[in-house]
A protein has these predicted regions:
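Nucleotide/phosphate-binding catalytic cleft detector across ATP-hydrolyzing
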Residues: 1-135
Length: 135
């Protein structure tokens, strides 16, 4: 009990509203620290991520053939798992701001109509994004 209380001082508790259009990141005691478009721009041929969020949104419809700006969620559920992981990784790293050495605990909002498989995909993507615990 004491150990958990001590650890909570060195980790960050976060909430993620993973939306089709926008993603919000809330950090306990700080409020909303990130509000970004849920868009990722990546290279089609090599798969590397070029931009995430607002920067990627600016690229929609303006990219050469080897770059694709896409929304990895549709109707609140994941349609591109790997791209969602890349997006969450970027957002969570920005929310951590390098002040902690422990991975954050994260609560993720999931649409009430999501199936069990869709819910599991959101939790798995969040865990793969480098958090310590996701619910």
């Amino acid at each position: 009990m004491i150990f958990n209380g001590l650890l909570s001082r060195f980790t960050r508790d976060m909430g993620v509203d993973l939306g089709t259009a926008n993603t919000l990141l809330y950090v306990r005691r700080e409020g909303i620290v990130l509000r970004e478009s849920s868009v990722v721009a990546k290279r089609v041929d090599r798969g590397g991520v070029l931009a995430v969020g607002s920067e990627a949104k600016k690229m929609i419809g303006r990219t050469p053939g080897d770059i694709l700006a896409t929304r990895p969620l549709r109707d609140g559920v994941i349609v591109d798992f790997d791209t969602t992981v890349a997006m969450l990784t970027y957002f969570i790293r920005n929310g951590r701001r390098g002040r902690t050495f422990l991975r954050p605990r994260v609560v993720v909002g999931i649409p009430s109509g999501a199936t069990e498989v869709e819910k599991r995909a959101v939790i798995d993507a969040t865990l793969q994004a480098g958090v310590g615990e996701a619910t």
